[in-house]
Amino acid sequence: MSKGQVISINVSPGGIPKISQPMIRVGIEGLEGDGHNHEKQRTPLQAVCIQDVEKLEELKGEGYSLVPGTTGENLTVQNLNVNNLPLGTILRFANGVVLELSKVRKPCYVLDSINPRLKEDIVNRCGTYAKVLCEGVLIQGESIQVVLPVVLPSEGEL
């Protein structure tokens, strides 16, 4: 099991950028005070959007001016590589919040306001959505424990 860390907690009433907060309450529908602009994004499977700070740094190296929250993620994390974790992975936060990775995030047209090329360049590094399994308070800097999903062998493999 690997450990990650919360670098930034980001919210906005809708749209981007999202603004960093030192701590925030997390409910089943997502982060308190955070809004989603599109009805299709208001689902429990997309309650929280998570992005790796390392992916933002990669994109900065390609000429994009990005900081945590710029691409609309709620949580900017370090040492997780959420884009490569399987769906169903559990993230246990030190203060008790538990999330489950539920859906790969696809680039959206709102990224055009940053740069029209970003939507293409961020494919496969846009982060992941998660559903909330256990509500609580997130605090910037807290650690995250990763629990990979158990994969049982199929009948043909027994």
Question: What are these model-predicted stretches?
Answer:
Residues 1-98, 103-105, 137, 148-158:
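Electropositive, beta-rich accessory/interaction domains or terminal extensions
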Residues 64-74, 112-127:
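Short, basic/aromatic beta-hairpin or loop at an interaction surface
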Residues 106-118, 155-158:
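Short, compositionally biased
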Residues 139-143:
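Short, well-structured beta-strand-loop connectors
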